[in-house]
């Protein structure tokens, strides 16, 4: 497994024959061309079909959609905000760092839209909501990207333990069995 966002890291993952690991940090329509490019590179280097991409994300799951949207905005938002400042996305420094073109793309989007816009983009990509809403989103993602592995976290951005536990248990009960049937 290799995190693969930039052109260089996608190429490295393909050369290694590794599963590309992609984070749910922007709409999947923006990610699809990079994922497909990595698959093409794998075929070129190895003459075989590439392994499934692993999608890594942060999930809020429950039964009351308005409450879940508030929780997702709060906790996924806190995670995005911490990344926003940790990576100093308001700066221009990624443009000069080889291998960080995807960060530069993210930085440009964040400079234009601010933290709120970054949170909106993150929430378009990440799983949050009722089990049915989450499943519909994952089905749409599968149609766009093909089969994938899923690495999902329920505790992030200050999420209280009870909210994390609620989401994990409900996801395991109602979402996971459907995913395992794919």
Model-derived regions, located:
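A short, mixed-charge helix-start or loop-turn motif at secondary-structure junctions
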Residues: 20, 120-123, 157
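Active-site-proximal loop/turn and secondary-structure-junction residues that shape catalytic pockets
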Residues: 26, 59-61, 156-158
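Flexible, glycine- and charge-enriched loops at secondary-structure boundaries
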Residues: 24, 28, 127, 161-165
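Long, low-complexity C-terminal extensions of enzymes
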Residues: 130-171
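An alpha-helical appendage that flanks or caps ligand/catalytic pockets
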Residues: 29-147, 180-182
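Hydrophobic faces of well-ordered beta-strands that scaffold small-molecule active sites
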Residues: 1-3, 18-23, 51-58, 148-154
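A conserved active-site cap/scaffold subdomain adjacent to cofactor or substrate pockets
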Residues: 5-35
């Amino acid at each position: 497994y290799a995190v693969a966002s930039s052109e260089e890291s996608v190429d490295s993952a393909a050369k290694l024959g590794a599963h590309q690991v992609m984070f749910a940090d922007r709409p999947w329509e923006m990610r699809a061309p990079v994922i497909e490019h990595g698959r093409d590179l794998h075929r070129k280097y190895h003459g075989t079909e590439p392994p499934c991409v692993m999608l890594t994300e942060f999930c809020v799951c429950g039964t009351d959609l308005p409450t879940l949207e508030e929780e997702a905005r709060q906790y996924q938002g806190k995670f995005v905000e911490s990344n926003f400042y940790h990576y100093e996305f308001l700066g221009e420094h990624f443009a000069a760092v080889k291998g960080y073109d995807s960060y530069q793309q993210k930085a440009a989007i964040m400079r234009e839209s601010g933290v709120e816009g970054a949170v909106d983009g993150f929430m378009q990509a990440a799983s949050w909501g009722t089990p049915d809403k989450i499943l519909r989103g994952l089905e749409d993602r599968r149609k766009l990207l093909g089969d994938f592995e899923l690495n999902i976290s329920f505790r992030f951005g200050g999420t209280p333990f009870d909210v994390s536990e609620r989401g994990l248990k409900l996801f395991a009960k109602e979402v996971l069995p459907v995913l395992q049937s794919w």
